[in-house]
Regions:
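C-terminal functional regions that serve as terminal interaction/effector modules
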Residues: 1-32, 38-40, 238-251, 256-258, ...
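An N-terminus-focused feature that recognizes amino-terminal "leader" regions
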Residues: 1-116, 120, 341-343
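Hydrophobic, ordered structural segments
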Residues: 2, 9-14, 92, 99-199, ...
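Surface-exposed interaction/gating patches
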Residues: 16-23, 34, 46-49, 63-65, ...
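Short, low-complexity cationic-aromatic patches
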Residues: 58, 98-103, 116-123, 235, ...
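Generic short beta-strand
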Residues: 65, 125-126, 243, 302
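Short loop/beta submotifs within extracellular cysteine-rich repeat domains
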Residues: 73, 132-137, 251, 309-313
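DNA replication sliding-clamp ring fold and its partner-interaction surfaces
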Residues: 97-108, 224, 273-287
Length: 343
């Protein structure tokens, strides 16, 4: 048996509640390398034709999909319909169901796992970037067609997969010579929220750097209790919101009402029938409200960041293209200017 896998089993026995990525870190390897070490035991490598793989998932029916970063875990049930994907990017477009934005150019490896658990065998497909970090995990559920799942695994198994070469993460080049006037001017000239990515790239600034550069009518910092306050307001009012959680390779989006909000110790949790969120509220270091111009008026969001600069999550009011933003959402965001009881 592979010594890495043996080490993993020992750690898992000692710390059964830890995620695989955390156990891999304790071993001193990436999660992708841990999966590679499990080949021949409970894992197989899959062909790296990611567009074909995601399109093939349409045949299996319902799956549970997990996209996460170091501070938030976003889980959504859904099916792989409306998959539009190329060599570098794409999307799975099912608002209020499985809704993904895919940065396939970042993807590097994929594995199928069959993990024994106390509740039976857990089947999953796990996709990783070139740094060995998971970008998307797809789990079979009781509603999944296991015959179609097994056919997919057989079709995509790569018995001759090349060994992984995991690259260290390089920090994005950022400038300290910020042209605040130009950033403010270009921000106000936007007509689509997606133009914001180009603005950041042109000026080589992070999102918080851009927020600090513009006027307070476009971006303002609020208390780090803002997420819990906003979710409480949305739950009480029953208006639909959007919650984005992403990493280098994938962003997963929930659209709907907050049904069950449950803080537990340092975790802020949402438990809906089709959607679950686990977010480490004590790791929120900066909370920003931003307003970006579009052809339908301003779109307002709450953006949350960790101390290392990771964007933990982003929230919007539900909005259909071509319609203005919810007035209720704007009122809820506006209430964040007033300190909460915990602030």
């Amino acid at each position: 048996m592979n010594p890495i896998y043996q080490h993993y089993l020992v750690l898992k026995g000692e710390q059964p509640k830890k995620y695989a990525r955390d156990l891999a870190a304790l071993i001193g390897i990436s999660e992708a390398e841990l999966c590679e070490a499990r080949i021949g035991v409970d894992a197989v490598a899959l062909k790296r034709d990611f567009p074909a793989l995601l399109k093939a998932l349409g045949a299996v029916g319902e799956t549970k999909n997990i996209t996460r970063n170091a501070y938030a875990v976003h889980e959504h049930l859904g099916e792989y319909h409306n998959v539009h994907i190329g060599a570098h990017g794409g999307l799975v477009l099912n608002p209020r169901a499985l809704d993904l934005r895919l940065f396939v150019g970042q993807w590097c490896s994929a594995f199928a796992l069959q993990e024994p658990t106390g509740q039976g065998v857990r089947h999953s497909i796990q996709i990783f970037d070139r740094h060995g970090d998971a970008v998307l995990k797809v789990y079979a559920t009781e509603q999944t067609s296991m015959a179609a799942w097994q056919t997919l695994i057989a079709d995509f198994t790569d018995a001759a997969a090349t060994p992984l070469v995991v690259e260290p993460v390089a920090a994005a080049p950022l400038t300290e010579a910020i042209d605040a006037t130009a950033i403010d001017r270009e921000w106000r000239a936007m007509t689509d929220v997606h133009q914001f990515f180009a603005l950041l790239k042109r000026h080589q600034v992070s999102r918080p750097q851009a927020f600090r550069a513009v006027g307070e009518d476009l971006a303002w910092q609020t208390g780090n209790d803002a997420l819990e306050r906003l979710l409480q307001m949305a739950q009480q009012a029953g208006n639909e919101i959007m919650i984005f959680v992403g990493n280098r390779g994938c962003t997963q989006i929930f659209t709907g009402r907050v049904e069950k909000l449950q803080p537990v110790e340092n975790w802020l949790n949402i438990f809906n029938p089709q959607f679950t969120l686990h977010l480490m509220a004590d790791q929120i270091c900066e909370s920003w409200v931003t307003r970006k111009p579009t052809g339908d008026g301003f779109v307002t969001s709450l953006e949350l960041f960790a101390a290392d600069g990771t964007q933990i999550a982003q929230l919007y009011g539900q909005r259909t293209e071509g319609t203005p933003e919810q007035s209720r959402w704007r009122e809820q965001i506006g209430a964040l200017r007033t300190p909460g009881a915990a602030a």
